[in-house]
Design a protein with these regions (language model features):
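Acidic-aromatic substrate-binding/catalytic surfaces of carbohydrate-active enzymes
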Residues: 46-134, 185, 296-302
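Active-site-proximal substrate-binding groove within the catalytic cores of carbohydrate-active enzymes
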Residues: 72, 278-284, 513-709, 716
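Acidic (Asp/Glu-rich), glycine- and aromatic
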Residues: 150-206, 689-695, 700-701
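The substrate-binding groove and active-site-proximal loops of carbohydrate-active enzymes
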Residues: 329-344, 369-385, 449-470, 481, ...
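Active-site neighborhood of glycoside hydrolase catalytic domains
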Residues: 457-547, 559
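C-terminal beta-strand-rich structural cap/linker in extracellular carbohydrate-active enzymes
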Residues: 713-736
Length: 736
């Protein structure tokens, strides 16, 4: 082991270390082998079925009318993940031929007349026939389990055949797990960039996420132990088109014994308002044993995303490790500001910030239009007086202008308090509830008479809405000369279950929502100016290929980890946090900026006046300069495991004011690691008022290091140094 002792991280200082190592890599390719070791213990029409996938052991109880998961365990160290009887699935069906429609649950653990478990070459096939409910006789389910011995993983598929003339399949709950505490248990779930919470098996814990969206950005979760024998279970819904689904994780009590963590994925069925609709899982569900933490779980998901996800950029779009269709100016931005108002109000302030920061700046411009915010959408034009001239002036000074528009909403009273074009033009393309009424949302904006503004959610599959958004975007890029357009809510708000049969999609679930936006954005990208960019709000993953940037302003929670950047770093630019006020605003400013840096995000999205304050400007200039020297790692590289630091490192706590008071506690010493080819950059940022000391532990093999010579470069507070030859021994020596 080598100990690199970092002597001091001074007050508000940021020290950065770049290691360059020459390593030989031997690429081995091997065919994936699917295999399962199985055992059956039968008696009285019942059997106990065991499926062994490498070191992951599963046991099922099969009865004439049910199948139950009895246990799931790490066979190597005898760590139990599931010890309480758990259903494989639950179906929710609705009787459609009665006025008082009620949803009926049917699970794998009861309610079937015929159940079978057939052993296959690589696992099992479970079949469920003839539900005991007399009117459900034409519903059957097939669940296929495949064991991958080499990966210690179980792969699941489910198909529901519904030949009922009166029942519609509404939702499929699959997978379904009741996880026992693995010992010092930790849960990773996909809110924002990914969030890790401890002690979730005790107390009152509940996470509910609607995918895809900013608060449920990915299709996987993980639970693992943080003790000396790390063992974890990765649960991934590997759906390559990102169909709408809900992830629910909650702490529940099963009887009088220890509490369990109930994890379910609930998927709305396509054509959920029509009797006789079927369901087939597009892709597969994966349970995989891993030994590590959130970073290892993220890498499992990344491996699948790069290989199969329809939204991941490939080919000419992502060549030589670089997102080629994103303009160079967008890739190379290091800092953003945002503000609101007329050209006279915003131009002097933004230009002054550009002068102070001495770097190119991205500018997110709100309220450039004459209509009020969140009102009279989508009638943004005419813009405020001299808007185009202001755009030209700012961009002449290396300020890249990105105006706000909404990509999802049409005001139901779209000319003051009058219904101007909504009913006559837009209503046919609005999303509809099953009763035929449009889905309508309100966000706090008011009409002149004090009533809430009611905004209809538009259906992205309709040509009317696709063409309207395209018209607005091209007006801004071509007529007004902006370098980017921000299209709000696309990667933030989850799909609504539109039931309008005149639209070109099945009612309810499926991936049609994503595919509608893909077509819209593809059409825009095909005709937009080559050097322009498209961005949107938050980081719901299925739109990455069609966007150049995600506004990650909502990454504001305790316990958040950079799982999303570990998966998508370089595939899209992530920028922006909400920077706000309060008595701890300066500390919160440093915490957010430092976290953005180590996460690989472009910095800022603050008001120019806040960032220009003397107590913030010095720190910001250092961190922007440092990012400019290492941005190639974020654009073309890949996140590596954050370095392991030891010592008496203090914590800091500040009110981030995300929603009222919003206290966030972090380490005072932020750190991260990124790799590009044979080089690794280790990043450290001290945000506290005191000098902080820490010890960095490096094991043989970390960051590709072997016992050899290496080049060391240190960038401190944005100041580069010459490379120095060093030797890194990995026995009992220490390098200081």
């Amino acid at each position: 082991m080598t100990l690199l002792k970092l002597i001091e991280f001074r007050r508000k200082g940021i020290g950065f270390v770049i290691f360059a190592f020459v390593i030989a890599i031997l690429n081995l390719s091997a065919m994936t082998v699917y295999s399962a070791e199985t055992e059956k213990a039968s008696g009285g029409g019942e059997s106990l079925v065991k499926c062994i996938a490498g070191e992951l052991f599963a046991e099922f109880y099969v009865a004439p009318n049910s199948v139950t998961l009895m246990s799931l365990a790490d066979g190597k160290i005898q760590k139990i993940f599931v010890s309480k009887p758990t259903p494989l699935f639950t179906l929710w069906l609705r009787q459609m031929d009665v006025s008082n429609r009620t949803d009926y649950p049917v699970s794998s653990t009861n309610g079937w007349r015929k159940v079978s478990a057939v052993e296959t070459a690589s696992g099992f096939e479970f079949r469920f026939l003839e539900p005991e409910e007399a009117t459900l006789t034409n519903v059957s389910v097939k669940v296929v389990l495949t064991a991958d011995k080499s990966e210690s993983s179980l792969h699941w598929k489910i198909e529901v055949e519904n030949q009922s003339a009166i029942y519609a399949l509404r939702n499929v709950v699959f997978p379904y797990l009741n996880l026992s505490d693995p010992g010092k248990g930790v849960a990773l779930f996909p809110r924002g960039p990914g969030e890790v919470q401890q002690n979730v098996w005790s107390g009152d814990f509940h996470y509910h996420g609607n995918y895809p969206g900013g608060w449920c950005s990915m299709q996987f979760v993980a639970a693992y132990s943080a003790d000396q024998n790390p063992s974890g279970l990765y649960i991934g819904y590997h759906n390559p088109t990102g169909s709408t689904k809900h992830i629910d994780i909650r702490n529940i009590a099963l009887g009088k014994e220890a509490r369990v963590l109930k994890i379910v994925f609930e998927t709305p069925a396509a054509n959920f308002d029509t009797a006789g609709n079927d369901f087939s899982l597009n892709g597969e569900v994966v349970w995989k044993l891993f030994r590590g933490d959130w970073f290892d779980a993220a890498k499992i998901y990344r491996s699948w995303v790069v290989r199969e996800a329809k939204w991941y950029p490939h080919g000419e779009k992502f060549k030589d490790g670089l997102r080629q269709d994103t303009p160079e100016w967008m890739r190379n931005l290091d800092v953003w500001v945002m503000t609101s108002g007329s050209p006279q109000e915003v131009v002097p302030r933004v230009k002054e910030f550009r002068k102070l920061i001495d770097a190119p700046v991205g500018f997110h411009w709100y309220n450039w239009h004459q209509i009020p915010f969140d009102n009279d959408y989508p009638h943004y034009f005419p813009a405020k007086t001299n808007f185009a001239e202001a755009v030209a002036e700012l961009q002449k000074n290396d300020v890249y202008v990105m105006p706000y528009i909404n990509g999802r909403l049409w005001d139901t009273r779209d000319k003051g308090t009058n219904d101007w074009q909504f009913s006559s033009v837009a209503l046919s393309a609005a999303t509809k509830q099953e009763n035929g009424q449009p889905f309508v949302e309100s966000y706090g904006s008011k009409e002149v008479n004090g009533e809430p503004v009611r905004l209809a959610v538009m259906c992205p599959t309709t040509k009317l809405w696709q063409n309207k958004v395209k018209e607005i975007v091209l007006n801004l890029l071509k007529t007004n000369g902006t370098r980017a357009v921000y299209i709000d809510q696309i990667a933030a708000a989850p799909p609504v279950l539109c039931a309008d049969k005149s639209h070109n999609h099945p009612a309810g679930g499926g991936s049609w929502w994503n595919e509608g936006y893909w077509q819209m954005l593809e059409d825009i990208r095909r005709v937009k100016p080559e050097n322009s960019a498209l961005t949107t709000e938050c980081n719901g993953e299925p739109f990455i290929r069609w966007m150049d940037g995600y506004l990650t302003w909502h990454w504001q929670h305790n316990g958040q980890v950079p799982a999303f950047p570990a998966i998508y770093g370089g595939a899209i630019q992530m920028f922006g946090r909400a920077y706000r006020g309060g008595v701890t605003k300066d500390l919160a400013f440093r915490m957010k900026a430092a976290q953005q840096l180590v996460f690989g995000e472009q910095l800022g999205w603050f008001e120019p006046d806040l960032a220009s304050q003397p107590q913030n400007l010095e720190f910001l200039k250092r961190i922007v300069k440092t990012r400019s020297l290492i941005r190639s790692f974020f654009n073309s590289g890949e996140m590596a495991r954050p370095p392991r630091l030891e010592g008496e490192i203090p914590t800091v706590k500040a009110d981030w004011q995300w929603s009222g008071e919003w206290w966030v506690t972090t380490s005072a010493l932020f750190n991260g690691a990124w790799q590009l080819g044979k080089e690794t950059v280790l990043i450290f940022a001290n945000v506290s008022e005191q000098t902080t000391k820490a010890t960095l532990h490096l094991e043989r093999g970390d960051y590709g290091m072997i016992e050899t010579n290496a080049n060391l470069k240190i960038i401190k507070n944005g100041v580069d140094s010459r490379e120095t030859k060093i030797f890194l021994p990995f026995r009992e020596n220490k390098f200081y």
